Design a protein with these regions (language model features):
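N-terminal glycine-rich FAD/FM-binding segment characteristic of electron-transfer flavoproteins
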Residues: 1-129
Length: 129
C-alpha cells in the first residue's frame, strides 16, 4: 500500500536506535491494518527505503491515525504529517516538538510501550476469534 493513501501509519524515528527495531513497528502496523512510516533519519541511516519516508523530502500523508514512536518532530517531518486526523506521539523527551502537534502525547520509553501495545492488541485479536 502506498503510504500516502494509508489510513493508519505507525511511524518511527531516530529514537528506534537501530534497523532491527523497525520489526516491532511493522508488527504493530500489521495488527492495525496500517503501514510503516519513518522520519528522514531512518532513511539516511539505511534502515528502510525512502518510499516509507514522511516529510518535506518524503511523502505528505493524511491518515486517520498517525502513531509516532521516537520521532522528535523536526519541522520537515511535521509538515508531512500535519494532515493526520489523530496524532499519537510516544517519546522519552517531554520537550520533543512532536508533542506540540500531537492529539495524545505519551512521555515514555518506546521500547516498553511498543511491546505492551502489541501484546494488548494481539490478546484482543485472539480473544475475538
Amino acid at each position: 500500500m502506498n503510504i500516502a493513501e494509508a489510513e493508519i501509519i505507525v511511524a518511527g524515528g531516530r529514537g528506534l536506535k537501530k534497523a532491527e527495531n523497525l520489526e516491532q513497528l511493522k508488527r504493530l502496523a500489521d495488527l492495525l491494518g496500517g503501514v510503516v512510516g519513518v522520519s528522514r533519519a531512518c532513511v539516511d541511516a539505511g534502515w528502510i527505503s525512502a518510499s516509507h519516508q514522511v516529510g518535506q523530502t518524503g511523502k505528505t500523508v493524511c491518515p486517520k491515525i498517525y502513531l509516532a514512536f521516537g520521532i522528535s518532530g523536526a519541522i520537515q517531518h511535521l509538515e508531512g504529517m500535519r494532515g493526520a486526523d489523530t496524532i499519537i506521539a510516544i517519546n522519552n523527551d517531554p520537550h520533543a516538538a512532536i508533542f506540540n502537534v500531537a492529539d495524545l502525547g505519551i512521555v515514555g520509553d518506546l521500547f516498553e510501550i511498543l511491546p505492551m501495545l502489541i501484546e494488548a492488541i494481539e490478546a484482543k485479536h485472539n480473544g475475538a476469534k
